[in-house]
Swiss-Prot record:
Metal-binding keyword on record: no
Stretches that traverse the bilayer: none
Keywords: Ribonucleoprotein, Ribosomal protein
InterPro entries with a match to the protein in the record: Ribosomal_bL36, Ribosomal_bL36_sp
Coiled coil: none
GO molecular function, a single term: structural constituent of ribosome
GO terms for biological process, alphabetical: translation
Any one Pfam family match given in the protein's UniProt record, by short name: Ribosomal_L36
Source species: Buchnera aphidicola subsp. Schizaphis graminum (strain Sg)
Gene field: rpmJ
Gene Ontology CC entries for this record: cytoplasm; ribonucleoprotein complex; ribosome
Protein name per Swiss-Prot or TrEMBL: Large ribosomal subunit protein bL36
HAMAP family assigned: Ribosomal_bL36
Amino acid sequence: MKVKASVKVLCRNCKIVRRKNVVRVICTNDPKHKQRQG
């Protein structure tokens, strides 16, 4: 899980999800693409 100021989609399987007022990127294809804004 990467913690970044600005999260970006890295591939076509990445999805931007908002959970508990935190923007996250989840990816079904590559777990390395997981990100959290903070």
